[in-house]
């Protein structure tokens, strides 16, 4: 029965109750149909397959497709992606199996991709190269450089690969390139100039440097920098919104005070805006990324991320050539921090990056000059330094710099100032390993010995000595190793010498140091240096280890002779089992078809030959084998071999890390890149663990529930911290004062109190008298003076300058009922603020004296429980009214009263009764209405979803750091320093000011009632409608209005 017939039988069984089976169906087939129908369901006449989802109780229903033509069309639609791209086999099957299902779906996807010509052409291009000549051509090696002149033609013929691989390579077809020029039918040719963009940027940059046509001045750290507003707004959304909000779009010149910004991080961004080249010190990459994120410069952030990806994917090596020192001591590493060396050259890397479309080059500058071999276009091969016999410490060798990323810009590594270096914790990134077993302390310079030994030994001889012949069996030592170990066989001939010698060879001393930023590269480097083993050898080795574990103690001589019966005749290895011995013999029988044309080594696989040829491309030859023999002799005298401790030092901050992976994670702090991003909200994180914790917050289900109370939590750690409240046991203790905390966040906040704060606040605001400890606090404070509000509520579109104010406001939308203090009546929308209020600021807890929270007015005797209400009331007595109406000039003591007053001009009534739909001007009037007529529907809190009237907390007249200059005002500015202020004056305002000036001459001043206030409003509205001033001038008694505050929300 085919798949279509079986699906039709299941469909008939589920839909036809009278005759569920076809006539003539056997009993065994009926049982199979009933069993299979348990996984299917029919909805709307269509058969669906129910598949169980992992970690979920529901089933995923997939439509079963019965028609072959429809199946072919669905596979084709899933294989083609957006833009005409072709998906892989796994992607096609994964997208298709989300909605549809039928038996053999994966096989049909495989067959379709095999018939796709574009996918097969892509597969041919990605086919690995197995021919040695093609590998040499790809790596840029010359065949004549490694061959001897007296070799015969028969030997040269052996270097080529088998004829089967040659025939496959001959079938490869070159991909032709087509250039298309689109020409309209009317004869209009559209072409673009690739040099136009750079030419325009060059002219703009020259105009900026020569102060031509500049219309904005940037004040940063007391210095002025000229620029163009159009260029700044095109590169940064921050400046664009600033110019639009301050009305500096159409004005001639504007001055922007950038207090809190640093020149070291801002000037590279300014240069990038005019040259599209980002040049900065690698140490300040984090500051540049943070400032670019603040200014909303997405291109700079992409460049910083691409730099980090280049270091991760391409394994970029920061190469620094200098003096290499070896240290041997019995003491700890901390004892050598004080030991210094003669002053040398300190290497500081400066990275220069161009745009993403620019050509990528990595230029290696050694002491300001290029190596001779690189200038000639050939890889440099330097002789290996020869370590002294007394020196036991070693430095990891420098790996060859890989090919740069094709999408990155120009990167150059340069050297700068001269500073002394430390013996162990050096700032240039060189990692030294110290043997603690040796009693003497030796400090040597490998660069001096390099000049002595480099002239005697050629790179080819060193490469031939260091690389043993792989044609021999792994059990037998090579010829080169025999010649090297003849002097040491008499003193110590144990099998442990070879392993210890290989460890010393892996940690051989080379000139230079490196920082490899890739996960797990240290282990891969050790595996690559070891002898490559095939799959058969690895299986045989596992069998040998298993046999040694299960090997029983010797009982008699007969059993021991039987165990040693399986012995290899070629390499001498002994196997306890016959199967392991047979698998081992297959290794010797298999032919080595791949031969290196440079050193005559033979390999069993093409991948092994490729890895071997890469070693020839290294610029520095490996350490000579003579250093290994001397180190073996020195170690042979001691009975115990000390273990080498390796540490990795950050060249930027000098921090010492135990693992290479820890250094890679540590470098994320210096680069400022957060590689892990949330797909829901877009928030980025440095660590993957932080992203997982953040993603759990988006999940609506709280899996972990407390057994003692009703609360549930998203993470297990939150549940454990909550359980500590019930049990009273806490695992977070302060090491300084011994205080315990239930949560780790509380401990981290507590530890900041023990940190000494600087005595002087180094960052001062130029607009007010406030000062701050950090620059980021000053930048955020400047948002209030500049009027920038980057934090916007997604519910009511209300904007804030401070993030904490925005967060508190967003919480008010999600909380149905606020947290209210039972004593003072203060309300909080955040539980943390409410708990802090109850714990610290109120009501005599923890031995405090009970505070009198009621504040009494000295003039009228009125009592207040909230401080802001008391201050507002005192402003009314003292006559401080910072909130002034721009329409009629009436001033108020608080913003709420001004909003209520402005709504009398506009006629807006935003507070609508949800029962009878009557609108009111404020929340107090609406609450009175609902209390009188709809007593059962009185809410706890009345808030507006979107408040159209937003005033500053300190008044409507606020000083701004952006000053608008006109052509007439520039002459006045040159005469002397004056404060500039912009005032918008209309015809209606002038008439109101004249009326106010006329009434101020009256000696008697009295307080207006609500009826008098409405007369003032009617006067302003009458002026707007064109009535005369004399009709209502008599109704005006005074303009000084004093109204008690009536809060909108209770």
Swiss-Prot record:
GO MF term list: DNA binding; zinc ion binding
InterPro entries for this protein: BTB/POZ_dom, Integrase_H2C2, SKP1/BTB/POZ_sf, ZBTB11_BTB_POZ, Znf_C2H2_sf, Znf_C2H2_type
Organism listed in the record: Mus musculus (Mouse)
Residue spans of biased composition, Acidic residues class: 143-156
Domain of life of the organism encoding this protein: Eukaryota
Name assigned to this protein: Zinc finger and BTB domain-containing protein 11
GO cellular component: nucleolus; nucleoplasm; nucleus
BTB domain span: 214-282
Summary of the function given for this chain in its UniProt record: May be involved in transcriptional regulation.
PANTHER family: ZINC FINGER AND BTB DOMAIN CONTAINING 11, ZINC FINGER PROTEIN
Pfam families: BTB (PF00651), Integrase_H2C2 (PF17921), zf-C2H2 (PF00096), zf-C2H2_6 (PF13912)
Stretch list, region Disordered: 143-173, 373-514, 543-563, 617-641
Organism taxonomic ancestry: Eukaryota, Metazoa, Chordata, Craniata, Vertebrata
Localization (cell): Nucleus, Nucleolus
Composition-biased stretches (Low complexity): 157-168, 378-399, 623-638
Entry keywords, A to Z: DNA-binding, Metal-binding, Nucleus, Repeat, Transcription, Transcription regulation, Zinc, Zinc-finger
Gene responsible for this protein: Zbtb11
Basic and acidic residues: bias regions: 478-501, 553-563
Disulfide bridges in this chain: none
Zinc finger annotations (C2H2-type) as residue ranges: 566-588, 594-616, 648-670, 676-698, 704-726, 732-754, 763-785, 791-813, 819-843, 855-877, 883-905, 911-934
């Amino acid at each position: 029965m085919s798949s279509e017939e079986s699906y039709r039988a299941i469909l008939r069984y589920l839909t036809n109750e009278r005759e569920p089976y076809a006539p003539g169906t056997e009993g065994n087939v009926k049982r199979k149909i009933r069993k299979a129908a348990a996984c299917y369901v029919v909805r709307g006449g269509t058969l669906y397959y129910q598949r169980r989802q992992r970690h979920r109780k529901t089933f995923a229903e997939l439509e079963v497709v019965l028609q072959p033509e429809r199946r072919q069309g669905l596979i084709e639609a899933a294989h083609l992606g957006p833009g005409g791209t072709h998906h892989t086999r796994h992607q096609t099957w994964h997208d298709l199996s989300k909605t549809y299902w039928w038996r053999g779906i994966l096989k049909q996807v495989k067959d379709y991709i095999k018939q796709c010509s574009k996918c097969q052409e892509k597969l041919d291009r990605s086919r690995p190269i197995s021919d040695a000549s093609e590998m040499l051509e790809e790596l840029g090696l010359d065949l004549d450089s490694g061959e001897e002149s007296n070799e015969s033609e028969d030997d040269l013929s052996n270097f080529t690969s088998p004829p089967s691989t040659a025939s496959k390579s001959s079938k490869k077809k070159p991909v032709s390139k087509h250039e298309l020029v689109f020409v309209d039918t009317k004869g209009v040719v559209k072409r673009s100039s690739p040099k136009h963009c750079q030419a325009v940027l060059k002219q703009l940059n020259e105009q900026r440097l020569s102060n031509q046509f500049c219309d904005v001045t940037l004040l940063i750290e007391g210095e002025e920098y000229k620029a163009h507003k159009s260029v700044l707004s095109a590169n940064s959304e921050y400046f664009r919104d600033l110019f639009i909000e301050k009305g500096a779009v159409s004005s001639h010149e504007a001055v922007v005070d950038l207090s809190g910004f640093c020149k070291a991080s801002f000037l590279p961004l300014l240069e990038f805006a005019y040259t599209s080249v980002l040049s900065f010190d690698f140490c300040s990459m984090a500051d540049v990324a943070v400032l670019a994120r603040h200014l909303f410069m997405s291109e700079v952030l992409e460049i910083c991320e691409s730099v980090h990806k280049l270091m991760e994917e391409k394994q970029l090596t920061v190469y620094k050539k200098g003096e290499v020192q070896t240290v041997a001591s019995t003491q700890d590493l901390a004892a050598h921090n004080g030991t210094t060396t003669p002053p040398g050259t300190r290497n500081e890397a400066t990275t220069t990056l161009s745009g993403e479309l620019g050509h990528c080059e990595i230029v290696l500058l050694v002491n300001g000059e290029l190596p001779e071999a690189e200038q000639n276009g050939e890889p440099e091969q330097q002789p290996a330094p020869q370590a002294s016999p007394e020196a036991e410490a070693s430095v990891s060798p420098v790996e060859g710099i890989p090919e740069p990323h094709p999408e990155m810009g120009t990167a150059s590594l340069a050297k700068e100032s001269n500073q002394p270096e430390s013996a162990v914790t050096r700032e240039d990134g060189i990692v030294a390993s110290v043997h603690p077993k040796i009693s003497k302390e030796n400090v040597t310079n490998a660069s001096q010995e390099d000049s002595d030994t480099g002239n005697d030994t050629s790179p080819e001889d060193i490469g031939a000595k260091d690389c043993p012949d792989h044609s021999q069996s792994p059990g037998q030592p090579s010829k080169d190793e025999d010649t090297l170990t003849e002097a040491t066989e008499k003193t110590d001939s144990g099998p442990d010498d070879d392993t210890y010698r290989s460890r010393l060879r892996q940690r051989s001393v080379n000139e230079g140091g490196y920082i490899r930023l890739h996960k797990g590269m240290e282990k891969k480097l050790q595996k690559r240096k070891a002898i490559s083993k095939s799959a058969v050898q690895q299986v045989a080795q596992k069998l040998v280890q298993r046999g040694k574990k299960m090997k029983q103690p010797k009982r008699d001589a007969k059993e021991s002779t039987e165990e040693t019966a399986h012995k290899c005749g070629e390499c001498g290895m002994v196997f306890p089992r016959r199967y392991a011995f047979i698998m081992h013999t297959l290794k010797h029988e298999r032919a080595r078809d791949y031969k290196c044309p440079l050193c005559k080594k033979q390999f069993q696989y093409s991948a092994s030959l490729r890895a071997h040829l890469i070693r020839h491309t290294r610029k520095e030859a490996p350490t000579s084998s003579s250093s290994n023999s001397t180190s073996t002799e020195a170690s042979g005298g001691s009975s115990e071999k000390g273990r080498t401790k390796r540490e990795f030092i950050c060249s930027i901050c000098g921090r010492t890390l135990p693992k290479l992976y820890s250094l890679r994670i540590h470098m994320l702090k210096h680069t400022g890149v957060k590689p892990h991003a949330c797909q829901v909200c877009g928030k980025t994180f440095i660590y993957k663990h932080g992203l997982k914790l953040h993603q759990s917050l988006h999940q609506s289900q709280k899996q972990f529930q407390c057994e003692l109370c009703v609360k549930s939590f998203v993470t297990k750690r939150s549940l454990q911290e909550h359980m500590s409240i019930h049990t009273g046991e806490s695992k977070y203790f302060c090491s300084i004062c011994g205080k315990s905390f239930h949560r780790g966040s509380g401990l981290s906040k507590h530890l900041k109190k023990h940190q000494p704060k600087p005595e002087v606040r180094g960052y001062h605001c130029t607009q007010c008298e406030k000062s701050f400890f950090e620059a980021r606090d000053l930048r955020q404070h400047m948002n209030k003076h500049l009027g920038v509000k980057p934090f916007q509520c997604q519910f009511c579109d209300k904007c804030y300058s401070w993030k904490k104010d925005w967060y508190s406001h967003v919480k008010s939308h999600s909380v149905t009922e606020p947290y209210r203090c039972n004593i003072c009546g203060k309300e909080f929308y955040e539980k943390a603020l409410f708990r802090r209020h109850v714990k610290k600021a109120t009501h005599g807890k923890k031995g405090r004296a009970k505070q009198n929270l009621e504040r009494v007015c000295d003039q009228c005797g009125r009592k207040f429980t909230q401080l802001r209400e008391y201050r507002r009331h005192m402003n009314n007595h003292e006559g401080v009214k910072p909130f002034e109406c721009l329409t009629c000039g009436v001033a108020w003591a608080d913003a709420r009263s001004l909003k209520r007053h402005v709504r009398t001009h506009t006629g807006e009534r935003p507070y609508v009764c949800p029962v009878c739909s009557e609108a009111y001007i404020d929340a107090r009037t609406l609450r009175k209405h609902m209390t009188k007529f709809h007593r059962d529907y009185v809410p706890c809190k009345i808030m507006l979803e979107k408040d159209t009237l937003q005033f500053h907390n300190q008044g409507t007249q606020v000083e701004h750091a952006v000053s608008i200059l006109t052509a007439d005002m520039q002459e006045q500015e040159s005469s002397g320093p004056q404060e500039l202020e912009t005032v918008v004056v209309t015809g209606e305002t002038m008439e109101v000011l004249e009326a106010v000036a006329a009434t101020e001459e009256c000696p008697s001043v009295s307080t207006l009632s609500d009826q008098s206030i409405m007369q003032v409003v009617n006067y302003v509205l009458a002026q707007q409608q064109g009535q005369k001033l004399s009709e209502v001038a008599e109704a005006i008694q005074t303009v000084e209005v004093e109204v008690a505050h009536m809060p909108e929300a209770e």
